[in-house]
Amino acid sequence: AGVGTVP
């Protein structure tokens, strides 16, 4: 989840 993150 989020920007530039997993997930």
UniProtKB/Swiss-Prot annotation:
It comes from Rhizopus azygosporus (Rhizopus microsporus var. azygosporus). This enzyme is capable of clotting milk and thus can be used for cheese production. One of its GO terms (biological process) is proteolysis. Its EC number is 3.4.23.21. Transmembrane segments: none annotated. The lineage of its organism: Eukaryota, Fungi, Fungi incertae sedis, Mucoromycota, Mucoromycotina. Keywords: Aspartyl protease, Hydrolase, Protease. One of its GO terms (molecular function) is aspartic-type endopeptidase activity. This is Rhizopuspepsin. The keyword ATP-binding does not apply. It is an enzyme of class 3 (hydrolase). Optimum temperature is between 45-50 degrees Celsius with hemoglobin as substrate. Loses 50% of its activity at 60 degrees Celsius. Optimum pH is 7 with hemoglobin as substrate. Belongs to the peptidase A1 family. It comes from the Eukaryota. It catalyses: Hydrolysis of proteins with broad specificity similar to that of pepsin A, preferring hydrophobic residues at P1 and P1'. Clots milk and activates trypsinogen. Does not cleave 4-Gln-|-His-5, but does cleave 10-His-|-Leu-11 and 12-Val-|-Glu-13 in B chain of insulin.
